[in-house]
UniProtKB/Swiss-Prot annotation:
Keywords: Mitochondrion, Ribonucleoprotein, Ribosomal protein. It is found in: Mitochondrion. GO terms for biological process: cytoplasmic translation. The keyword Mitochondrion applies. PANTHER family: 60S/50S RIBOSOMAL PROTEIN L6/L9 (PTHR11655), LARGE RIBOSOMAL SUBUNIT PROTEIN UL6M (PTHR11655:SF14). This is Large ribosomal subunit protein uL6m. GO terms for molecular function: rRNA binding; structural constituent of ribosome. It comes from Prototheca wickerhamii. Belongs to the universal ribosomal protein uL6 family.
Length: 194
């Protein structure tokens, strides 16, 4: 009979990062030089497979589980939170196509005073311009009218915004025109031959 052994994984908390428990039992706030992010342990481990313990005095996180693959998963997710509040995450998009371009409307230039989010105006060959409102916690920079940089503290939110912008005009399989990730390779098809 196979015996199960408990595997422990220890993550050291970096110096400039502070962790504070909130009023809710399973939610912790991670604060760093770039801002703060929260982690919900109940949402992270829905099935109760692992025991995740934040030891704030010793500046470490202890993950204890019977399954090593879950230890690696939870370790990577927590390290991504630490990396996000200390360095941040960037995703680069490029727009390919004649006349395709993006413009950024800053929230200070818009008429509404309640709105604090920037808006990206995309000209992608449609009969109308596409306005994409950037959510809170994410910043968008235009390096040129055809290059978009998406920056934020939460990796999940940054990649979700990048995917939403890319889906407004995904790359064409025949000519490759559209919005793509900077290092993405588009496999194009050949057209019909007569």
């Amino acid at each position: 009979m196979k015996t199960l052994s408990i595997l422990d994984t220890i993550i050291k908390i970096p110096e400039k990062i502070e962790i504070h428990p909130t009023t809710t039992e399973y939610i912790y706030t991670i604060t760093g030089p770039l801002g703060s992010s929260s982690i919900n342990l109940k949402k992270l481990d829905k099935n109760g497979i692992a025991c995740i313990n934040f030891d704030i005095q010793n500046k470490q996180v202890l993950i204890r589980s019977l399954y090593p693959k879950y230890n690696g998963l939870y370790k990577k997710l927590i390290e991504n939170k630490f990396l996000g509040v200390s360095r941040g995450f960037c995703v680069y998009l490029e727009i390919v196509g004649v006349g395709y371009r993006a413009a950024l409307l800053s929230s200070s230039l818009q008429n509404s005073t309640k709105d604090t989010n920037d808006t990206i105006v995309l000209k992608l060959g449609h009969s109308h311009d596409i306005h994409y409102k950037v959510p809170n916690g994410v910043r968008v920079f235009l390096q040129s009218p055809s290059e978009i940089c998406i920056f934020g503290v939460d990796l999940n939110q940054v990649t979700q915004v990048a995917h939403s912008i890319r889906n407004t005009r995904p790359p064409s399989v025949y000519k490759g025109k559209g919005i793509r990730y900077t290092n993405e390779k588009i496999v194009t098809k050949t057209g019909k031959r007569k």
